[in-house]
Every structure is written in C-alpha cells, then in structure tokens.
Curated annotation (Swiss-Prot):
The keyword Nucleus applies. It holds the Pfam family G-patch_2. Keywords: mRNA processing, mRNA splicing, Nucleus, Spliceosome. Residues 13-28 have a biased composition (Low complexity). Residues 1-90, 111-181, 285-312 are annotated as: Disordered. One of its GO terms (cellular component) is spliceosomal complex. This is Pre-mRNA-splicing factor spp2. Residues 1-12, 164-176 have a biased composition (Basic and acidic residues). One of its GO terms (biological process) is mRNA splicing, via spliceosome. Belongs to the SPP2 family. InterPro entries: G_patch_dom, Spp2-like, Spp2/MOS2_G-patch. The gene is spp2.
Length: 541
C-alpha cells in the first residue's frame, strides 16, 4: 500500500488514493484487484505528460504476468446516455445501457372494480371451520380440537342394541318417573277479521283520506356480520383518493432529462417484460406458453366481401363468403363431406342447396347433377348410334323422307375434270346424299360467281331439342381435304353435315367460282328446307 505523492508548492496532489491486491489463481496466473477512490476535490485536471506507475504490494517476476490494471478517475455519470465520465471528461463506458422503467401493480383499478361488484361471496362455513382453515394456511395446528359426534352408518343387516339402563329382574317393581309440569299452550291472541270488519275498516280509512291499505307487518333484514375477508366497497370519491395515494413520487428534472424521447416507449415496454425481437401488443411477454406467438408478427387478414362490421365469417375459409342460411357448423361439415365424396373440392363448406331447372317443353324439373348425367348418356349414345339411323329419324320428323327416293338430280352438267375428280354443276330443287364416286374418285361441287352460296351447320342432339351452330361457306373460300380455310368461321367438313340452310344469293363479286370437295369414301347428307331456292347435290352419276 502506498500513498499519493507529497504535495508540491503547497498544492494538494490530484492523484487519488489507490489500493492494489494480487494473488495466485488456479491456473498459475496472478489475479489482481484494484480499488480507486477519486479525490473529493480536484484543483486542476491531471497532467498526461507523466506516465503512471501502479503501486502493488509485491511484484511478480513471471513472464506471463498480466498487464497492470489501468486506473480511471470517475467524476460522475452522464444523465443523457447513462455512461460513466472520468475526471477529464471522457466517457469510460462505450456501450449504451438499456433504459428500463418498471411498472408497479399496486395501483390496479381492476381490483377496486372487482371489490365494488362483490364477486367474492360470503364464506358460509361455520366460524370453527374457518378458524381451522386459517390455522392450516398459517401452518399452525388448531387448539382444542373437538371431535363432532356423527351418527354411525352401518350397511347390511343391523340389530337393535339393548338399552344400557339398570337391568330389572322379573317379579320386581319398576320405578316410574314423575311427569313434569304441563306447559300452557301458546294461543295466538289475534283473531282473523271477518268480512264485515274488513269492510268497516275500509270505510273508516276512506273517510280519513287513506286510499292505500296499511299493515303492521315487518320484514327484518338479515344483519351482516363484520367480515375482514370481505372487501370494502369504494365509491367514486374513495376510489379517487386511493388512486392518488398510491401514485409514485413525481420524477425530478434530472430523471426526466436522463431518458431520451425516442427511448421512452421502449423503456416502458422493457419494464413490462418486453425484450428485443418480440412483437408488440400480442401475448404475455416472457412466458413459455406464448413465446412463439410473441415473436411472430401479427399480420391482419383481409375481411371477406359483404361482411358487416362486427360479423364473423362462418365459412372459415380465407376470403370466402358465407352462403345465406349457412348458420350451422354441423350442416357445413356435412356439405363439405358430401362435396368431397362427389368428386368436388373437400374444403367446400356450406349447406347443400340444389338448383332445380325446368324443361320448357316437358315441364319436368331436374337438378344440375341429373342434367350432367343426361349429357353424359347422350354423348355415349351418339358414338354408338349410326348416322344413318339419326338421318332417317330426323327426316321422318320433318316429313321429308320422300326426298331420298329421287335417283338423279334434275339437271346436272359436267363442266370438266379437276385432279382426276368429277366436277359437277347444276340446279335442282332437292339435294341428295353424297356418296363416294365410282372408281374411287373425289367429287367437287363448284358454284359460279353470283349464283348461289351454301351454309353448312352441325347439329347437337339433346333430349330437349336441337342446338345448331352454323358454318358459313361463302364465295372465294376454298375447302381443302375437308377443312375450311381462309374464313373467319373455321369448321371441319370431314364427317356428317347435318343441315343445310336456305341458300343466299350473292351480290356482285369478283370471284369466279368456289368449290366444295368431298373426298373419296366420305358421306355427306344434304337436307333442304321448304324455302330453299337452289342448291347443289352430288350423286353417283
């Protein structure tokens, strides 16, 4: 131990009193501790030109000796940053300390409201039992424990026990007890009033101006015994006084300046148990049960459409709208299971409400499932049924079955051969089915410019009627290998053309002629309505 240097020129030294201790540790190295006491009053800041030499009790000559401890003069603390300031004004602690404002729970307004509501009921147990319970809570044993006599319970066959009085021998007189004095029977002096007396009293009260009947009956209220466990009810004035009395002392100006404005909210949250990295406003901080929820951010979900304020989405899906009438959870689960078994989406929830459709012709009501089944059956039958049978059936319905008996076209003129096929041109009132030409040649039907054009359509058969979608072939559109090309409406010629609508006369056009070609081995049925003017048909001629 050494003291500071002697004062020079009559001035006290600014170097503080220091104490250094050293000892051997477990690893062979010396451990040192230094205590530094700053001077009570420094006249001037110490000079940095002279090197400081630490003072120790003894020196250790080991090569692995740690560096001597550095002495720091602490002059105070920074109220803004919370760091330690040395005697020369430098900050010793570089790291910034976290500010925490603890929140005390002494002034809890919920406890006062709960006391006023009287949620805690009165203890109805006997006082002896309450005293025993209180002694057990304090860890004491209740004195003068008395066993209460209770009737013994026996099960099975039981026999009556003989009386324990004095046994009398046969032939002796038995002692008889004298009967006590008779107690007089209490008789109610009040007699019930007769109807005449009641009417007389009513007249007397009416003459005195008493409109309401009075009675001398008294209902006594049960007097409430003083119970310390019962909370004291507080009114607004008492609650305000308790609130003011339980408030902490106001903060000083230095404490107010020590906390920066931008860290005030975080300091309050740290006092409530919040830590860095946790989300704000969800769960209880520091608990293991809500640790995951506290760390995960809360993302607000978008409300479903047409959902009113305060209403809840009963469907359960994200953004799903509840169907009107779907109020029961059991019905929703039933609808979801039914939708999953029928091949639909399993997450569909809601009450199953089938939509009925009415056929205009037959008046029959069918559901969507039945309509889907009928469409599937129609598609299956369409592939199996022969087109000739459908042709005969349609012609029989329209009354034009006799058209097929014609053998030749009314007028048919051979214009020439194109690509080895037969080019035919003519005018007729009926159009016969196109059959493969003799010799396996392709057939081509040409229409001169300004004469006629052909509209070909396909027919889809249903149980309720025919749905026709047309393909229009105009002048200047070529048909190559059964495929319409160069037109806005493209359709397939390969197969069966079920219907040909009335021909339309073309206006003046620059196109010379158009051709409709039927390849070898293909069949085309041409059916003309009553308003048909001119059309063209190909036959085996």
């Amino acid at each position: 131990m050494s003291s500071s240097e002697s004062p020079k020129d009559g001035k006290p030294s600014s170097k503080p009193f220091s104490l250094s201790l050293s000892g051997s540790g477990s690893n062979g190295r010396s451990r040192k501790s230094a205590f530094n006491i700053p001077p009570a009053r420094a006249a001037e800041p110490p000079s940095r030109t002279l090197a400081r030499r630490p003072h120790r009790l003894h020196d250790d000559e080991s090569d692995e000796e740690e560096a001597p401890p550095a002495f720091e003069d602490v002059a105070g603390f920074d109220t803004h940053t919370g760091t330690v300031l040395s005697a020369d004004g430098r900050a010793v602690d570089k790291e910034k300390r976290e500010l925490v404002i603890p929140v005390t729970s002494k002034n809890n307004w919920r406890d006062r409201v709960r006391a006023n509501r009287g949620t805690r009921g009165k203890n109805l147990l006997p006082k002896e039992v309450q005293a025993m319970q209180e002694a057990e809570r304090r860890g004491e044993t209740a004195e003068n424990d008395q066993e209460t006599d209770r009737p013994s319970m026996s099960y099975g066959l039981s026999f009556a026990k003989p009386s324990q009085g004095e046994e009398t021998k046969p032939g002796e007189d038995q002692a008889m007890k004298d009967a006590g004095p008779l107690k007089p029977q209490v008789v109610d002096e009040r007699k019930p009033l007769t109807q005449d007396e009641i009417a007389l009293q009513a007249l007397i009260r009416e003459s005195k101006g008493e409109t309401e009947g009075r009675t001398d009956l008294v209902i006594e209220s049960a007097k409430r015994e003083v119970d310390e466990s019962y909370p004291v009810r507080l009114d607004e004035t008492g609650s305000f006084r308790v609130d003011v009395a339980s408030r902490p002392e106001p903060a000083t100006l230095d404490q107010y300046n020590a906390i920066p404005v931008e860290e005030f909210g975080a300091a309050l949250l740290r006092g409530m148990g919040w830590k860095e990295g946790q989300s704000i406003g969800r769960g209880k901080y520091g608990t293991s049960a809500t640790d995951y929820r506290s760390q995960s951010p809360r993302i607000p979900e978008r409300r479903p459409g047409f959902l009113g304020i305060g209403a809840k989405d009963v469907s359960g899906g994200k953004g799903a709208e509840a169907e009107l009438g779907a109020w029961g959870r059991a019905a929703m689960r039933k609808g979801a299971r039914k939708a999953e078994t029928q091949g639909g989406e399993g997450n569909t929830q809601g009450v199953y409400m089938p939509v009925l459709m009415r056929n205009k012709k037959t008046g029959e009501y069918i559901t969507e499932e039945e309509l889907t089944a009928l469409k599937k059956e129609g598609k299956a039958k369409k592939g199996d049924d022969d087109w000739r049978e459908r042709r005969d059936r349609n012609l029989e319905k329209s009354g034009r079955m006799d058209i097929l008996v014609a053998e030749t076209i009314t007028t048919m003129t051979a214009i020439g051969l194109t690509d080895g096929g037969r080019v035919l041109h003519g005018e007729t009132e009926v159009c016969h089915p196109v059959i493969d030409s003799p010799g396996g040649e392709s057939t081509t039907m040409k229409t001169a410019a300004g004469e006629t054009t052909v509209i070909i359509a396909t027919e889809i058969e249903t149980e309720t009627g025919a749905i026709v979608s047309g393909i229009k072939i105009e002048t200047g559109i070529g048909i190559e290998r059964g495929v319409v090309t160069g037109a806005a409406d493209i359709g397939m010629m390969i197969g069966i053309a079920r219907d040909i609508h009335p021909l339309m006369r073309l206006a003046g056009t620059d196109v010379i002629e158009t051709a409709i070609e039927t390849l070898n081995g293909e069949d085309m049925m041409i059916n003309v309505s009553e308003n048909a003017g001119q059309c063209f048909g190909l036959d085996r001629t």
